[in-house]
Amino acid sequence: MKKTQGFSLIELLVVVAIIGVLAAVGIVGYQQYIDNTKGDVAKTNAQSFERWIQSTQIARSGGLTVQPSACEKKAGSLTDCFTTVLTAAGAPFEKFKNPYTSSGANIFAYDNSTTAFTEGQPCTGRTWNSGSTDNGSNITSAISDAFNTYGLIVIQNLDNASADLNRTDNSLKVGYCDGDGNFKIVADNISF
């Protein structure tokens, strides 16, 4: 009769240790992958917003009807356009979600202050003129917590207080707040 031998305790411990090391390395790599993906989604969302601004500006310049109607060429402030009307049902950004947070997350914010955003500047402490969360709430105050700025799309009026929906040459800067809460520029000086 043949004697059957299994693994010794030492061999089993070595195998468990190797599996533990591989799992630890895999978890760190996976978390980095998730963080990079969130950053890519935030950038893509801001680029989509920029493309919407550019195509809507072309329609407005040509006298065409645009949706939502709050963004048409007419008397009023740009603040009237960059509000919850953009994330309401049937609006261009109805399905937008913030990749960093869940329900109630900040989607975009509009600023017409005299202080321009610069690349890498913290997104906290600004008082927003308007904006929207993904549940339809309006943003009209400062966001003090850096986490709540992650993934936020930022539209800044470079013409400051002279922003007028009746004009089609309002100069805008579009960007987003990255996973560190710092501003990243997507487009500078685009017309609307």
Residue ranges of predicted features:
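Periplasmic/extracellular, small/polar-rich flexible segments of pilin-like filament-forming proteins
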Residues: 58-192
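Membrane-proximal N-terminal amphipathic helix
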Residues: 35-64
